[in-house]
A protein has these predicted regions:
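Flexible glycine-/small-residue-rich
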Residues: 11, 23-27, 38-39, 61, ...
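Residues embedded in well-ordered regular secondary structure
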Residues: 3-6, 14-20, 28-30, 34, ...
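Soluble periplasmic/extracytoplasmic beta-strand elements of cell-envelope proteins
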Residues: 8, 20-24, 34-39, 56-60, ...
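Extracellular/periplasmic, surface-exposed regions of secreted and cell-surface proteins
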Residues: 33, 123, 150-153, 188, ...
Length: 652
């Protein structure tokens, strides 16, 4: 975070939550996550990895590097290589750490007196009588009530060993984290195994495995604590109950501590993840290398949530005790599985002759992704309270007459052919080009399943020219530029081939009149649907000064997303469908300066980077169309403005 120009990393503070990473802005309304490539396997998250098992991480931003990833490369690529054994004796490494975290910069809120004054001013402006705050004597900072100081610990052990022909790595880790909100806790156990064996001098095989068991945190929202009136006391000691909120709020929200405390530990969730690959690599005819790799990733997530009966103190009702909700216990249960299977076949040619150097790669890859989810919910039967016991939190114990269910499933496949060439002349003039052709089942019914992606790039190492040799303080100067096209098929829903008929309404027809069921299409099919395309280019320079101690890099970039996937407004009583109806532009400047030096046996470094990102929606569906998000409709996306800009009154 903060070390690489053009990369934004946002941590929510929730225990175990994945950081939000954006590379050079937001390219689409349908997802911003970069592609992770872990030891060759494509992935959309890396929560199964132990940070201690990561050997290196590289972030690709420029078009010439991303185009080779085709339909998956539009949002940037993060390449992660996990640790492997290095030749030498067997080594055992054990490390552990612990720490604490807390919210140090809370949002400033008015106290009870200030709230009463502002709320009554609002009522007067609306022509309404003032609210009687007489029974509301509290002065509560709800943020203080819900926040805690969280404890964090990470513990790892690894064993490595290698010989001239064989190497292995075994790593295991345990992480535990408490969240910023009371009762939040998260734990993860990880396992990493790799084994490589050199069968002959020119043929080797190996495998990689990563596994994880995660107990995710039952996270609660901070929003209620920011909206709850400070005039309400937290707790009524006489009744031993949390208090309700004033009448103007209690219909919309509960006392924040009801969710944080009384609903704590009411969810039992377990996530399992297994990811790995096997490969074979053959070097032949001096300059050729052929590599085959088969990879698989499987995730299984299950959860059970219990709904307890909750009573709160309310002085405005007879008896002063109110039961929230329907007064019934309930259980919700779900199971989700996702499988990813990938195969890669790569042929590489490398040669150097005279002043020329060439590396060429050709390949064929396949990728398959399938997700299935099934969930259900039941409440208690008459007089049959579901016990507050995790062993009983299964929907089979509830009343079948109250059962509801949900499901989600989809599968997609991608087939790709690719090629890339890297060439340099005299180590001064650098050229590269790539081509990738992707075919996706997501668009197979439209006839637009195939898409080509290209890139070209060039660099000039000016410092290697004769006319630069006399500049002693300049060690390296390089000018560079690239252009490429990228793709994006990401959408938070499947691409169904045929719409279903749903029995949504009834109609009266005939004489004598009779009621007949009415049907409508579940969505508007679009036979011309195609995936989003991103055209990007950049130009910049790199330089090293003062015996390579000072490094500078500056880049200007521009990316334009076309054929943006968006929902088409419903017409003639139909549900909205999906269409290519928008475009987005991102452009900006990246500057980075780093200084590295040594003083005796001590090394030190200092760095600074600056990134500007200007995001703008160029067009979206039709004039005046907007996408509204947020519980108070405070986030808008519409043409002429950035994605998700804040919408509201301007005040001084």
């Amino acid at each position: 975070q903060g070390k690489i120009a053009g990369v934004q990393v946002i941590n929510s503070g929730k225990a175990g939550a994945d950081p939000e990473i954006r590379v050079r802005g937001t390219n689409s309304i349908n997802g911003y996550k970069p592609l992770y490539v872990v030891d060759g396997l494509f992935n959309d998250n890396i929560n199964f990895l132990n940070p201690q098992d990561i050997e290196s991480m590289e972030i690709l931003k420029d078009p010439s590097s991303l185009a080779i990833f085709g339909v998956r490369g539009a949002n940037g690529v993060i390449i992660i290589t996990t640790k492997k054994a290095k030749e030498g004796q067997t080594r055992v490494n054990i490390n552990g750490s612990f720490g604490f975290k807390r919210v140090t910069d809370k949002i400033a809120m008015v106290d009870a007196a200030g709230f009463k004054e502002l709320y009554n001013e609002q009522l007067r402006n609306e022509g309404n009588p003032e609210f009687d705050f007489t029974p509301w004597t509290g002065n509560t900072d709800w943020q203080d009530e819900i926040f805690q100081t969280g404890f964090i610990t990470n513990n790892n052990v690894s064993i490595t060993g290698a010989s001239a022909r064989h190497s292995f790595y075994l790593g295991a880790g345990y992480a535990y984290e408490q969240g910023n909100i009371k009762h939040e806790k998260y734990s993860k156990v990880t396992l990493n195994i790799s084994n490589d064996y050199k069968v002959t001098d020119n043929f080797k095989v190996g495998f990689q495995f990563n596994g994880a068991r995660i107990l995710p945190a039952d996270t609660k929202s901070v929003a209620t604590a920011l909206r709850a009136a400070p005039v309400a006391p937290v707790y009524n000691a006489e009744y031993g109950l949390y208090t309700t909120l004033p009448g103007f709020q209690k219909a919309q929200m509960n006392n924040p501590m009801v969710d944080v405390d009384l609903k704590a530990n009411t969810t039992r969730a377990e996530n399992y993840r297994a990811s790995g690959n096997v490969y074979g690599q053959w070097d032949f005819l001096k300059n050729f290398q052929f590599k085959v790799m088969y990879s698989m990733d499987y995730a299984s997530n299950s959860s059970r949530t219990y709904t307890p009966v909750i009573n709160v103190f309310d002085s405005s009702v007879e008896g002063n005790v109110v039961t929230l909700g329907n007064g019934k216990t309930g259980v919700k249960q779900s199971k989700e599985t996702e499988a990813k299977v990938q195969s890669d076949y790569l042929l590489t040619y490398t040669n150097t002759w005279g002043d020329h150097s060439l590396t060429a790669t050709a390949g064929f890859t396949t990728y398959y992704n399938k997700l299935e989810m099934l969930g259900g919910e039941r409440t208690q039967g008459v007089g049959l309270v579901i016990p507050d016991n995790p062993d009983k939190w299964y929907i089979s114990i509830g009343d079948a007459a109250t059962a509801t269910n949900e499901s989600k499933q989809w599968e997609r496949s991608t087939v790709s052919m690719l090629g890339r060439v890297l060439y340099n002349y005299k180590g001064r003039y650098l050229f590269n080009g790539s081509f990738r052709r992707d075919g996706s089942s997501a668009f197979s019914y439209t006839g637009n399943q195939w898409q080509n992606f290209y890139s070209v790039g060039a660099g000039w190492l000016m410092s290697e020219e004769e006319f630069m040799k006399d500049i002693t303080w300049l060690d390296m100067l390089k000018l560079k530029g690239s252009w490429g096209t990228l793709g994006n098929q990401n959408l938070d829903k499947a691409y169904p081939a045929e719409p279903l008929l749903t029995n949504a309404y009834s109609a009266v027809f005939g004489k004598p009149s009779a009621i007949y069921p009415g049907y409508q299409l579940s969505y508007l099919p679009n036979p011309r649907l195609r995936w989003e395309k991103v055209e990007a280019w950049e130009a910049g320079a790199e330089a090293n000064f003062f015996r390579n101690r000072l490094h500078f890099e500056g880049v200007y970039y521009k990316k334009t997303t076309k054929d943006l996937l968006a929902e088409v407004p419903g017409i003639s009583g139909t549900v909205p469908g999906i269409g290519n109806l928008g475009s987005i532009e991102n452009k900006g400047v990246e500057l980075a300066i780093d200084w590295r030096d040594r003083i005796g046996d001590w090394g030190y470094s200092a760095g600074f980077n600056l990134t500007t990102i200007k995001n703008k929606v160029l067009s979206l569906v039709q004039e005046g169309y907007s996408i509204i998000a947020g519980d108070k409709s405070q986030s808008y996306t519409m043409a002429g403005y950035p994605i998700g800009y804040f919408y509201g009154y301007k005040v001084e």
